[in-house]
Amino acid sequence: MAAKPKLYYFNGRGRMESIRWLLAAAGVEFEEEFLETREQYEKMQKDGHLLFGQVPLVEIDGMMLTQTRAILSYLAAKYNLYGKDLKERVRIDMYADGTQDLMMMIAVAPFKTPKEKEESYDLILSRAKTRYFPVFEKILKDHGEAFLVGNQLSWADIQLLEAILMVEELSAPVLSDFPLLQAFKTRISNIPTIKKFLQPGSQRKPPPDGPYVEVVRTVLKF
């Protein structure tokens, strides 16, 4: 029996959360080792596991993988969440990159000053409602299918749901003008593996709080 993938990262969302989502949606069990001290981080660097000196790090299939985008692409292809051909794959890439841009705006906000954080959240909500969500509402309207690409679950769907839920944590009614996205959210959330991941007690991480921010600052020295 193959070993479970092992994820090395902080005990929080950051750049690892989309990886957790993808594995969970694929029904893949995984282990986690949480980065809590500077010494752990320096040992990982010394051991040569961090290609560019950065986490996340994922141990899978005899490999130590770094760089979030590369990890997500590998997992999507491995678990049949990456479309049926190159044309579907590039659309999945475009949609996933778009939602990743939105989610990274949210991920970095807790590390800002209170004033900057408030301004960031206002900008995030504005961008979500005027730049990102209208695009996905139109995609769903134009093809009339249940999923974003190829009428089957893909990385793009999983990451869009992740992004929607993150933005809803800032403003619960953010989807009020997007009925197709509301239906999409309900539909994808009810896929059994995803529904399980959304339940309390799963490996899904909560929004970043003060202690999480301090651990990241201490370990990475910024």
Swiss-Prot record:
Modified residues (N-acetylmethionine): 1
Gene3D superfamilies, alphabetized: 1.20.1050.10, Glutaredoxin
GO CC list: mitochondrion
GO biological process: glutathione metabolic process; response to caloric restriction
Catalysed transformations (reactions): RX + glutathione = an S-substituted glutathione + a halide anion + H(+)
SUPFAM superfamilies, per database record: GST C-terminal domain-like, Thioredoxin-like
Modifications after synthesis and translation: The N-terminus is blocked.
Enzyme Commission number, as recorded: 2.5.1.18
One Pfam family of this chain: GST_N
Any one GO molecular-function label of the UniProt entry: glutathione transferase activity
Positions that bind glutathione: 9, 53-55, 66-68
Record-stated family: Belongs to the GST superfamily. Alpha family.
Role, per record: Conjugation of reduced glutathione to a wide number of exogenous and endogenous hydrophobic electrophiles.
Extra facts: On the basis of immunological and kinetics data, GST 5.7 is distinct from alpha, mu and pI classes of GTS. However it has been postulated that this protein may be part of a distinct subgroup within this alpha class. The variations were found from AA sequencing and imply there are multiple forms of this protein. These variations are likely to be sex-linked and tissue specific.
Protein name from the UniProt record: Glutathione S-transferase A4
Species annotation: Mus musculus
Source species taxonomy: Eukaryota, Metazoa, Chordata, Craniata, Vertebrata
